[in-house]
Each structure stands twice: as C-alpha cells, then as structure tokens.
C-alpha cells in the first residue's frame, strides 16, 4: 500500500483520501506491534482512537463522494463503514 496512488501533488496531503491512507498505514504498524506486545494498553487505546478517526473520515467521504469512497475501500482492502441506523 503506497501513498503515491492517492497523491496528485505534494500539496495534497490534507485531502481526505490521503488522511485515510495515512491512518490505515499507522493502524497496520500498530496492529503488528500489538501482536508482539499484548499488554501494551496505551497502544491499544491509541489504536482505538485511530480507528475512530479513520471511521469518521470514511463516513464523511461516503457522504461527500461515494465513488471515491468505494474506490478507496477496494484499494485499501478495508471493510465498509456501518451505516447509521437512525
């Protein structure tokens, strides 16, 4: 998974897609760390926070641009966000 797929220019680092890719990369690193260090509770808390931030960004992207959202989910191989029940 590379960031260059989603970056058109160097100034585009604030885009939603780039932020989601960046969070996904950090989540993968932290998941591998937690496989070795199971009792690292501070890292577990950080992982939950990152998952929440990525989830909020994904739901925002799905409301703004559904085609970009679907492409991003397929390329990153992550599950689709749960839809609001209300």
Curated annotation (Swiss-Prot):
Signal sequence coordinates: none
PROSITE patterns to which the protein is assigned, alphabetical: RIBOSOMAL_S15 (PS00362)
Pfam family, one: Ribosomal_S15
SMART domains for the chain: Ribosomal_S15 (SM01387)
Single GO term (MF): structural constituent of ribosome
Entry keyword set: Plastid, Ribonucleoprotein, Ribosomal protein
GO biological process, one term: translation
InterPro entries per the UniProt record, alphabetical: Ribosomal_uS15, Ribosomal_uS15_bac-type, uS15_NS1_RNA-bd_sf
GO cellular component: plastid; ribonucleoprotein complex; ribosome
UniProt-annotated location(s): Plastid
Gene3D superfamilies: S15/NS1, RNA-binding
Main localisation: plastid
Source taxon at top rank: Eukaryota
UniProt similarity note: Belongs to the universal ribosomal protein uS15 family.
Quaternary structure and interacting proteins, as annotated: Part of the 30S ribosomal subunit.
PANTHER family: RIBOSOMAL PROTEIN S15, BACTERIAL AND ORGANELLAR, SMALL RIBOSOMAL SUBUNIT PROTEIN US15M
Protein name: Small ribosomal subunit protein uS15c
Organism: Cuscuta obtusiflora
Source organism phylogeny: Eukaryota, Viridiplantae, Streptophyta, Embryophyta, Tracheophyta
GN (gene name): rps15
């Amino acid at each position: 998974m590379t960031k260059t797929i989603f970056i058109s220019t160097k100034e585009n680092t604030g885009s939603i897609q780039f932020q989601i890719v960046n969070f996904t990369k950090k989540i993968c690193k932290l998941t591998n760390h937690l496989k070795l260090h199971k009792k690292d509770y501070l890292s577990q808390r950080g992982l939950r926070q990152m998952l929440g931030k990525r989830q909020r960004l994904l739901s925002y992207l799905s409301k703004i641009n559904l085609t970009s959202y679907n492409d991003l989910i397929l390329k990153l191989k992550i599950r689709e966000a749960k839809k609001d029940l209300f």
